Amino acid sequence: MADNLEPLEPSLQNLVEQDSLKWIFVGGKGGVGKTTCSSSLAVQLSKVRESVLIISTDPAHNISDAFDQKFTKVPTKVNGFDNLFAMEIDPNAGLNELPEEYFDGENEALRVSKGVMQEMINALPGIDEAMSYAEVMKLVKGMNFSVVVFDTAPTGHTLRLIAFPQVVEKGLGKLLRLKMKVAPLLSQFVSMLGMADVNADTLSQKLDDMLRVITQVNEQFKNPDQTTFVCVCIAEFFSLYETERLVQELTKCGIDVHNIIVNQLLFLQNSHDSCSMCASRFKIQEKYLDQIADLYEDFHVTKLPLLEKEVRGPESIRSFSENLMKPYNPKGEPKE
């Protein structure tokens, strides 16, 4: 690109101020501080949005540790906030991870549909995780949060999360065809148990409803006005390599990505006062920061500091989140 182009604002202010955004994914290599960054972003969004939900799709469920509060698969208000909620799901658990209330109903059909759907899904390798995402999306859309932030698992899981609408759309067709085969058996089985209200049409309707939601989500995921992805990395070779792979895959999937967070940076004010290891690490980070500047000159690149203490608890996250909105200043910002 031309040298006279102005660098983009080195913060996430552009995302926080984009009122149209509905889905924001935060991801990257393991151990780079995704959860701290996603939690901090959610805190900043809660200042300008009516209601914010942060969802952890990482089986490690670090947002409970980050906010120092236990979260479950049901949205729970974060302590110290009026409009920030959090929930944790394990996509590997499939439909068993969903709240039981989702399958409650006035007749036996809805109460047994969870088990039947799980058995049908198990017949299609690879779709279980995608269906879990699909059901979560259906639940979340019904809750009408202003914006949803995803604290994703390491890169491989993240790419599957992004691709799940296409997987589900293909898989639902197979499920509906499978339904036609098992419908007679299902009807005989439930008749023996005296559950006259249960029929294959109930399951079919549930799958059709889900397909409509997923088609809509798929369209929203590829709309940069509604969905974007924030890549988190550290200034090291493997993390930068993983970030570039992630950016390329997201671009291939049609997902907007124009923000990168470089976390855990050393800000040496006086190299003479630093230890030899710190000075060495600083030089390594400077080398990769130069590469990031060359690779992502059309991205907003936010630089975050390595702190002496861990960022944990709502007040600590609230304080750290300010670094997302304006460039970190080691002289003006006291260390936590």
From Swiss-Prot:
Binding site for Zn(2+): C275, C278
Class of the enzyme per the UniProt entry, highest EC level: hydrolase
CDD domains: ArsA
Entry keywords, A to Z: ATP-binding, Cytoplasm, Endoplasmic reticulum, Hydrolase, Metal-binding, Nucleotide-binding, Transport, Zinc
Positions annotated to bind ATP: K29, G30, G31, V32, G33, K34, T35, T36, E236, N263
Organism superkingdom: Eukaryota
Major localization class: cytoplasm
Coiled-coil ranges per UniProt: none
An example Gene Ontology biological process: tail-anchored membrane protein insertion into ER membrane
Active site: D58
GO cellular component, one term: GET complex
One Pfam family per UniProt: ArsA_ATPase
Entry EC no(s): 3.6.-.-
MF-aspect GO terms: ATP binding; ATP hydrolysis activity; metal ion binding
Subcellular location as annotated: Cytoplasm; Endoplasmic reticulum
Record's signal peptide: none
Protein task: ATPase required for the post-translational delivery of tail-anchored (TA) proteins to the endoplasmic reticulum. Recognizes and selectively binds the transmembrane domain of TA proteins in the cytosol. This complex then targets to the endoplasmic reticulum by membrane-bound receptors, where the tail-anchored protein is released for insertion. This process is regulated by ATP binding and hydrolysis. ATP binding drives the homodimer towards the closed dimer state, facilitating recognition of newly synthesized TA membrane proteins. ATP hydrolysis is required for insertion.
Stated family: Belongs to the arsA ATPase family.
Alphabetical list of PANTHER family matching this protein: ARSENICAL PUMP-DRIVING ATPASE ARSENITE-TRANSLOCATING ATPASE, ATPASE GET3
Subunit-structure text: Homodimer.
Protein name listed in UniProt: ATPase ASNA1 homolog
Native species: Drosophila melanogaster (Fruit fly)
